[in-house]
Amino acid sequence: MKHKIHFHIKKNDIVQLEITGMTAEGRGVGRCGEIAVFVPYTAIGDTIEAKILKVAKTYAFGKMISLIKPSQDRIEIDCKYFTKCGGCTYRHMTYQAELEVKEQRVRDVLNRIGGFSDLPMKPIVGAKHPDHYRNKAQLPIGIDDNQSMIMGFYSNRSHRIIDCESCALQPKSFTQAMDVFRKWADTSGNDVYKEETGKGRMRHLYLREAGATGEVMACVVVNGNGLYHEDTLVKQLREHVPGLKSVIINSNREKTNVILGKKCRTVWGSDTIKDTLCGLTFHISPLSFYQVNRTQAEKLYAIAKEYAGLTGEEILLDLYCGTGTIGLSMAHQAKRLIGVEVIEAAVENARKNSQINGIENAEFICGDAASAAEVLEKQGLRPNVIVIDPPRKGCDQSLIKTISRMSPDRVVYVSCDPATLARDLKWFTEEGYMPQEVTPVDMFPRTAHVETVVLLTNEFPK
């Protein structure tokens, strides 16, 4: 007869662990008897020594203090800020290993939560270049203990600024702009905003780059209307940032964590920069919603379009449409496109994007997806295809019931959280919509996030 071995671990204990799995947040999982110990910045196959930081009934959190035997997937860390700033989760392992972790996570969650053990899944769509893909940076500005200006990224789960000169996830132009701004700020006479008091002028440096055109926007978020010596900043940015097309001041006087205020003033250049996505043109302002990884977004949209199976005769309903990018990328293959989005500014962007691209068969409605869909269903709308791209919390069950009553032939579900996806797919099956195929997409390499595209078909067409 086998007896379970019970380990009584407590805070500050030192334990040896073999990492055998990963959590959704990217922490390695090792076991002490029945206790699962979660340790960040480890890889499957690592043997480590860990210090226990916190203990619950069935699990604990630890910190690696020594690497006894490295995993074959472990690589040398190439960023001095890794583990300090909250930007990356997986810089310590090969990109192939990261993709395998993400694909397995989708597979496991669909099985465990949804009960989909044999659902066909295509290999995860990885990035050709897993670094330098982010086309937007929001860099908080602060003061260190020596009263010197710092600028960079927040430490994981905190508002403590890690001073960074560059970021491996961002393009070279951002490093150039950061360097120029830092040197200018030191002698400009502009003071730094302090969250505690709401006093001070410089809040954030906000950068955007258009991947297709190389155009760069530099925006300074200020607690006020402007900055001293703006002309000098423009001159220096123009000299050192080759793709620069726009310098903007954004005014945010609110004592808030929201980065951008509503008022923008163009100091030099154009109000927007221009990019292309899936053959469409987009004009991007500081306030525009836009995909952070343009290249991977194009791959994801191509999969969604393939699953939609449009022939030119369909009514397409795009729920949680944001600025309309997914729906607009399919509009030429549809008879009619209706987009629904709850954020008014995003709806305005969507309408503008359709006008810029001469798309005349699209309309956009501002409203909650579940409520708007119910109204449209009662009005008699019967779309052939519905695309849904909900936030992390997934769909309301009431929306899924409304979709079922609309009786589309196909539903394309774009998910940013495998757990809520699995739950929602289960609800869809109860309404007669069966998932046919799943494709994970790595939209944000080196982070723990994974996107998933699913095709569902109507088993009981009316």
Where on the chain are the PLM-derived regions?
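Terminal RNA-binding accessory module
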Residues: M1-Y81, E363, S371
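Rossmann-like S-adenosyl-L-methionine
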Residues: K2-Q16, A24, H229-K462
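Short, acidic/hydrophobic/Gly-rich beta-strand patch recurrent on exposed beta strands
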Residues: G28-G33, G152-S155, C219-V221, A350
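Residue-level signal for inorganic ion chemistry
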Residues: G30, G45, C88, L205, ...
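Short beta-strand micro-motifs enriched in acidic
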Residues: T42, K51-V55, P140-D144, R208-A212
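Extended interfacial segments that mediate partner engagement and assembly in macromolecular machines
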Residues: I65-I77, T83-V192, A212, L227
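Short, solvent-exposed loop/turn elements at beta->coil junctions and helix N-caps
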Residues: K122-P130, E195, R203-H204, P440-M443
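Short, aliphatic-rich beta-strand segments
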Residues: L207, T213-N223, T281-S285, V385
